[in-house]
């Protein structure tokens, strides 16, 4: 059972996640890595606006300061 936020991220490694950012931006992709600051690495990522894909990336790094939530 996950007791801490980083445990949840660890359990979500190599699985699809949705990451909501400040400014109503959203990314969907496979979580490949994270650190204690919640900086995230997503592979096969898509940037979403209003539920529509606006950009695709083979890999993206998201700064933890901008993360509102991560949904596994």
From Swiss-Prot:
The keyword Calcium does not apply. Transmembrane segments: none annotated. One of its GO terms (molecular function) is RNA binding. SMART domains: Sm. One of its GO terms (cellular component) is ribonucleoprotein complex. Residues 4-72 form the Sm domain. The keyword Ribonucleoprotein applies. PROSITE patterns: SM. Pfam families: LSM. Keywords: Ribonucleoprotein. Gene3D superfamilies: 2.30.30.100. InterPro entries: Lsm7/SmG-like, LSM_dom_sf, Sm, Sm_dom_euk/arc, snRNP_Sm-like_arc. Belongs to the snRNP Sm proteins family. This is Putative snRNP Sm-like protein. It comes from Methanosarcina acetivorans (strain ATCC 35395 / DSM 2834 / JCM 12185 / C2A).
């Amino acid at each position: 059972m996950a007791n801490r936020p980083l445990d949840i991220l660890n359990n979500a490694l190599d699985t699809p996640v949705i990451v909501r950012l400040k400014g109503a931006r959203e990314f969907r992709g496979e979580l490949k890595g994270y650190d204690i600051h919640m900086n995230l690495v997503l592979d096969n990522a898509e940037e979403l606006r209003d539920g529509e894909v606006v950009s695709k990336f083979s890999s993206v790094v998201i700064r933890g300061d901008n993360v509102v939530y991560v949904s596994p």
